[in-house]
From Swiss-Prot:
The active site is at 115 (n6-amp-lysine intermediate). The gene is ligA. SMART domains: BRCT (SM00292), HhH1 (SM00278), LIGANc (SM00532). Zn(2+) binds at residues 404, 407, 422, 427. InterPro entries: BRCT_dom, BRCT_dom_sf, DisA/LigA_HHH, DNA_ligase, DNA_ligase_AS, DNA_ligase_CS, DNAligase_adenylation, DNAligase_N. It comes from Shouchella clausii (strain KSM-K16) (Alkalihalobacillus clausii). This is DNA ligase. It catalyses: NAD(+) + (deoxyribonucleotide)n-3'-hydroxyl + 5'-phospho-(deoxyribonucleotide)m = (deoxyribonucleotide)n+m + AMP + beta-nicotinamide D-nucleotide. NAD(+) binds at residues 34-38, 83-84, 113, 136, 170, 286, 310.
C-alpha cells in the first residue's frame, strides 16, 4: 500500500470508527460486534504507525491516550461556569417558582434534568473541531485537561456540523466501571476510590492520558456556554441541538409546564435514583425560555433562572468516640464529632459537625453515644440525633471549655450569638486559619501554600501574619519538609505574582468579618484605595449600596485596630497592590465617554484584538461586556463572520460597530 492509498484508507477507517463509536457510546445502539470495532481500530493504529505524518488530532486513535503532560495549564472560561443555588425540599422549589414568576410573569415552563455526580467540564470547538477541554475550577479559571478528555468516547472530537461552540457537561464514571476499577485496585493492594465521582475526577486529573483512557469514562452534555451562528429559543431546544451535533444528552431530561410537574419529577427520581447505571445527587431545574434567562440574570454566585434540588441526604448510625474543638479565623470555637468510620452517601465519614454548644445540649450528646449522622446536601456530615435507648450507662457527659483550646484566653459569647469565641487577636489558631484564608483561591490565590505548608511556616516561626509571607527567603523555605528547589522557586514566584492582585482580592483575603467576595469588590470600587477605606466613617460606609449596619460597624472596628494599621503598612512596603485597578467612577465620567455605563457584546473574529484584550479595553473605559444580545444591550462590536448575534442586534435596532470603529473609539479615548 502506497502513501496515497494509506491516506484514503485512513479516511475511511476514521469515518467508520467515529460512526460506530457514536452509536455505541452515545446512542447505546451498537452497529457492529466489539471484535469488528477492535479489528478496524488495530488497522487504523498500524497505518498511523506506518505513516505518522498522516495522524490527525481528531483521529479515533487519540482515545487511547498520548504521552504524559508535565502539568496542567490554567485557562480562563470566556463565560463563567457558575454554581447553582440549592433547594432541599418542596417549599424551596415553590419559593424558587414564586421568585421566577414575580420577575417574568405567570406563564413559565421548566426543564428538569438529572444532576449527575461527576466532574463539570467545558469543551470548546472551533469550526466543529475540539480544541480545548477544561475543568470548572473556581468557575472563572479552570485547568486544561484536553488530552484526557479526548480519551472519553462520548465526547465528539469533531462535531456533525462545523459550529464554533463552547459546551458544558458532566464527565462521570458508570457504576459498573467504578466497581471493576475498585476490584482491580483491591487486587493490586492499592487504595480504593471512595465513590464514582472521586474516581472520575481523579482519572481526568492524571498527567498521563493513557490512565484516563483505561477508566471507561463517559459524559452527558447539558448546556451551551457560547455558540456562533445558531439561535435557539429554549433550553430544551439547546439540548436537542447538542444531540444533533453528536453529544450524549441524557434521555431523562423533561419539559415541565408547572412547578407541580417539577415536584413530581424530583419525587420520581428521588425514589428511583439507585436504578440508574450512574450516580446522581439531585435534579437541576431550569427556566425553559432563554429570553427569560436574560430577564432573570445572575447573582454574584449563581443564575436566578436555575436551581439544584438536592435529594434528602442518607442517614446512618455510628458511635461518637470524642469531640474535638477547632478555632476558626474569626475566633469561633466549633465542636466536631470524632466517629467510628461509616459509609454515608458513598463516602467514608470519620468526623461530623456538631455546630455549637447549644446543639450538643439540646440533643443531649454524650461521648460513647450511638448517633445518627446525615450528610447535609450530600456534602457536610453532621450529627442530627442520638439513640438514647442504646445507652449502656458508660457514656460520658461533654462540657464546652471556658478557655480557648489554643491560647487559653477566656471564651465569650457575644450578644445575639450561639457560638463561643476567642477574642484574642494573637491566638495562634486564628492567625493560622487567617493565613489559610488569605492564600485561598478566592482571595490572594497563592499556589503551593496549602494548610500543611502554612502550618510548617507557623511552627518554625517564619510567619506571624499575612505580610510575613512577602518576607520569606529561599533558604528558609528549603529547610521545610518536602520543599525542594523547584517547589520553593514556584512558591516564591506565586507569592511575588500575588502582589499584583486586585484590591478586592486583598480586602477579601484580610478576612474582615461580614465582608465576603462581593462586598469586597463593592468596597474596592467605591473607595478606590486602601487608605480611603481605612479613613471611611460609619456613615460613609452605610451610604454604599449593599453595605448594612453590621458590616459598616465591623469595617470601622477593624481599621481602628493598631495592629491592622501595622499590618497594612507592612503589606504596602512589601509592594502589595493597595489600589483599585478596575474602571474607576471618575475615569468613567470624565474619560470613557463612549463606553461609560454601556453594555457591549463582542461577536465574530477580530483581527487587531484578541477577545480578552477587547473586553479589558471596554471594561477599563467604563463598559460591561456580556455574551448575548438582548434589549439591554447598547452596542455590538461585529468582526468577521459575526453570525446570529449581529442579526439579532439588527432586528431589535441595536447600534452595531465594525472593528475599525471600535479601534478608533478606543484610540480617541486614550489620547
Amino acid at each position: 500500500m502506497d502513501k496515497h492509498q494509506a491516506e484514503k484508507r485512513l479516511k475511511e477507517l476514521r469515518l467508520l470508527l467515529e460512526d460506530y463509536g457514536y452509536h455505541y457510546y452515545v446512542l447505546d445502539t451498537p452497529k457492529v460486534p466489539d471484535s469488528e470495532y477492535d479489528r478496524l481500530m488495530n488497522e487504523l493504529l498500524q497505518l498511523e504507525a506506518d505513516y505518522p505524518d498522516l495522524v490527525t488530532e481528531d483521529s479515533p486513535s487519540v482515545r487511547i491516550g498520548g504521552p504524559p503532560a508535565p502539568s496542567f495549564k490554567k485557562v480562563a472560561h470566556r463565560v463563567p461556569m457558575m454554581s447553582l443555588s440549592n433547594a432541599f425540599n418542596e417549599e424551596d422549589l415553590r419559593a424558587f417558582d414564586r421568585r421566577v414568576r414575580q420577575a417574568v410573569g405567570e406563564h413559565v415552563s421548566y426543564v428538569c434534568e438529572l444532576k449527575f455526580d461527576g466532574l463539570a467540564v467545558s469543551l470548546t470547538y472551533e469550526n466543529g473541531k475540539l480544541v480545548r477541554g477544561a475543568t470548572r475550577g473556581d468557575g472563572t479559571i479552570g485547568e486544561d485537561i484536553t488530552n484526557n478528555l479526548r480519551t472519553v468516547p462520548a465526547i465528539p472530537l469533531r462535531l456533525k456540523q462545523p459550529y464554533s461552540i463552547e459546551v458544558r457537561g458532566e464527565a462521570y464514571m458508570p457504576k459498573a466501571s467504578f466497581e471493576r476499577l475498585n476490584e482491580a485496585k483491591e487486587q493490586a493492594g492499592e487504595e480504593k476510590f471512595a465513590n464514582p465521582r472521586n474516581a472520575a475526577a481523579g482519572s481526568l486529573r492524571q498527567l498521563d492520558p493513557k490512565i484516563a483512557a483505561k477508566r471507561n469514562l463517559s459524559l452527558f452534555a447539558y448546556s451551551i456556554g457560547e455558540v456562533e451562528g445558531k439561535n435557539v429559543q429554549t433550553h430544551f431546544d439547546s439540548l436537542m441541538f447538542l444531540k444533533e451535533l453528536g453529544f450524549k444528552v441524557n434521555e431523562e431530561a423533561a419539559e415541565c409546564e408547572t412547578i407541580e410537574d417539577v415536584i413530581a419529577y424530583t419525587e420520581k427520581w428521588s425514589e428511583r435514583r439507585h436504578e440508574l447505571p450512574y450516580e446522581i445527587d439531585g435534579v437541576v431545574v431550569k427556566v425553559n425560555s432563554l429570553a427569560d434567562h436574560e430577564k432573570l440574570g445572575f447573582t454574584a454566585k449563581s443564575p436566578r433562572w436555575a436551581t439544584a434540588f438536592k435529594f434528602p441526604a442518607e442517614e446512618v448510625l455510628t458511635v461518637l468516640r470524642d469531640i474535638e474543638l477547632n478555632v476558626g479565623r474569626t475566633g469561633v470555637v466549633t465542636p466536631t464529632a470524632l466517629l467510628d468510620p461509616v459509609l454515608v452517601a458513598g463516602t467514608t465519614v470519620r468526623r461530623a459537625s456538631l455546630h455549637n454548644e447549644d446543639l450538643i445540649r439540646e440533643k443531649d450528646v454524650k461521648l460513647g453515644d450511638t448517633v445518627i449522622v446525615k450528610k447535609a446536601g450530600d456534602i457536610i456530615p453532621e450529627v442530627v440525633g442520638v439513640l438514647t435507648d442504646k445507652r449502656t450507662g458508660e457514656e460520658v457527659d461533654f462540657h464546652m471549655p471556658t478557655e480557648c483550646p489554643e491560647c487559653h484566653s477566656v471564651l465569650e459569647r457575644l450578644e445575639g450569638e450561639v457560638a463561643l469565641r476567642c477574642l484574642n487577636p494573637k491566638c495562634p489558631a486564628q492567625i493560622r486559619e487567617g493565613l489559610i484564608h488569605f492564600v485561598s483561591r478566592n482571595a490572594m490565590n497563592i499556589d503551593g501554600l496549602g494548610e500543611k505548608v502554612i502550618s510548617q511556616l507557623f511552627l518554625h516561626q517564619l510567619i506571624a501574619d499575612v505580610a510575613d509571607l512577602y518576607l520569606l527567603e529561599r533558604e528558609e523555605l528549603l529547610q521545610l519538609e518536602r520543599m525542594g528547589e523547584k517547589s520553593v522557586d514556584n512558591l516564591l514566584a506565586a507569592i511575588e505574582a500575588s502582589k499584583e492582585n486586585s484590591l478586592e482580592r486583598l480586602l477579601f483575603g484580610l478576612g474582615i468579618r461580614f465582608v465576603g467576595a462581593k462586598a469586597a469588590k463593592t468596597l474596592a470600587y467605591e473607595f478606590e484605595t486602601m487608605e480611603r477605606l481605612q479613613e471611611a466613617t460609619f456613615e460613609q460606609l452605610l451610604a454604599v449600596n449593599e453595605i448594612g449596619e453590621k458590616m459598616a460597624d465591623s469595617i470601622v472596628s477593624y481599621f481602628q485596630k493598631p495592629e491592622v494599621a501595622t499590618l497594612l503598612e507592612k503589606l504596602a512596603n512589601a509592594g502589595v497592590n493597595m489600589t483599585y485597578t478596575g474602571p474607576k467612577k471618575a475615569a468613567i465620567a470624565e474619560e470613557a465617554g463612549v463606553f461609560a455605563g454601556k453594555t457591549v457584546v463582542l461577536t465574530g473574529k477580530l483581527s487587531q484584538w484578541t477577545r480578552k484584550e477587547a473586553q479589558e479595553k471596554i471594561e477599563a473605559l467604563g463598559g460591561t461586556v456580556t455574551g448575548s444580545v438582548s434589549k439591554k444591550t447598547d452596542l455590538v462590536v461585529a468582526g468577521e463572520d459575526a453570525g446570529s448575534k449581529q442579526k439579532k442586534a439588527e432586528s431589535i435596532g441595536i447600534e452595531i460597530w465594525t472593528e475599525e470603529q471600535f479601534t478608533q473609539a478606543v484610540e480617541q479615548s486614550e489620547q
